[in-house]
């Protein structure tokens, strides 16, 4: 195999990677579903002792390949279920529970909204961007329908087929069809429009490796308005075999407000940060402690447990018109 080290968990992940790599297709079918369920169940138990960034180059290469495979399979799965949902004659959004991971999205979106609310100080965002929304934009749908009921959502995806099926998904809904818009574009080509968003969500699989992720973050830092919030998804422990890791030091030009590591079936960690600089009202958003070089060393981060027994890492520190 060449990838694995003497660790039972990592060996199991390596074994599943080998099997998944040999699949004839990553589109939903019995073999694909079985192997990916095994992979998720293997990676999901919290294990803070697992640090993928310190593993061998062979393991790092396997992980990088596995994340790309997971991203491709996730895209096929979302396309599959979005097509099923849009086949209903009534409102497709009434049948979202058919998607096998819908409850996970409900929990993740609630966690993200709670963190967002804690850092908005009573302000309700008028405009929200979701970058990498995909064919089944569940985060946008759940946030718009359950939490941010007056906000306008702009979904960006580079894949025209993803946007086409996603737009059909909300077209029958009398509310979301008026508040949710889809843009087929590479986010690296979007500049001035980014200044019009109060909150920007970056999907976990936009930028599948460290270099790509940092490049996207640098672009957002250049064009987002000071004071706007950036919500990112990361991964912790063995879950980092499924999704890329975002570390505080990757967010130059932003103040990291919170990092949240769920310990239940919600896979993604949540990172919330604020764009630094002087906003249109003359308010300067800067690090309260001026510690601009926040370390990536987790031992320097104060870790506490919240009431839900999930890990939260609290860091020091406390309009363009509607797009068409």
Curated annotation (Swiss-Prot):
It is an enzyme of class 2 (transferase). InterPro entries: Nicotian_synth, SAM-dependent_MTases_sf. The keyword tRNA processing does not apply. GO terms for molecular function: nicotianamine synthase activity. Keywords: S-adenosyl-L-methionine, Transferase. It catalyses: 3 S-adenosyl-L-methionine = nicotianamine + 3 S-methyl-5'-thioadenosine + 3 H(+). Belongs to the nicotianamine synthase (NAS)-like family. This is Probable nicotianamine synthase 4. The lineage of its organism: Eukaryota, Viridiplantae, Streptophyta, Embryophyta, Tracheophyta. The gene is NAS4.
């Amino acid at each position: 195999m060449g990838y694995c080290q003497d660790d039972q968990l990592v060996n199991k992940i390596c074994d599943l990677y080998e099997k998944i790599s040999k699949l004839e297709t990553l589109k939903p079918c019995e073999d694909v579903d079985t192997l990916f369920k095994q992979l998720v169940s293997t990676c999901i138990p919290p294990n803070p002792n697992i640090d993928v960034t310190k593993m061998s180059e062979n393991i790092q290469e396997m992980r990088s390949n596995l994340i790309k495979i997971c991203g491709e399979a996730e895209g096929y799965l979302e396309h599959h279920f979005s097509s099923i949902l849009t086949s209903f004659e009534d409102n497709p959004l009434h049948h979202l529970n058919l998607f096998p991971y819908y409850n996970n999205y409900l929990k993740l979106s609630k966690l993200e909204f709670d963190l967002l609310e804690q850092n908005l100080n009573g302000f309700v965002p008028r405009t929200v961007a979701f970058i990498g929304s995909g064919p089944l934009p569940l985060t946008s749908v759940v946030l718009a329908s359950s939490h941010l009921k007056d906000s306008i959502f702009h979904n960006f995806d580079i894949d025209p087929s993803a946007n086409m099926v996603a737009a059909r998904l909300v077209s029958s809904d009398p509310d979301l069809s008026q508040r949710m818009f889809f843009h087929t574009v590479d986010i690296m080509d979007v500049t001035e429009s980014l200044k019009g968003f109060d909150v920007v969500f970056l999907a976990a699989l936009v930028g599948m490796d460290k270099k790509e992720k940092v490049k996207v973050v640098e672009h957002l830092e250049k064009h987002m308005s000071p004071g706007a919030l950036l919500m990112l998804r990361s991964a912790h422990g063995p879950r980092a075999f499924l999704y890329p890791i975002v570390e505080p030091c990757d967010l130059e030009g932003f103040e990291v407000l919170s990092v949240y590591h769920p310990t239940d079936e919600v896979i993604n960690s949540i990172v919330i940060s604020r764009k630094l600089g002087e906003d249109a009202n003359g308010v300067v958003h800067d690090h309260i402690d001026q510690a601009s070089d926040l370390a990536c060393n987790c031992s320097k981060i104060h870790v506490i447990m919240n009431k839900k027994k999930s890990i939260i890492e609290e860091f020091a520190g406390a309009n363009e018109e509607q797009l068409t």
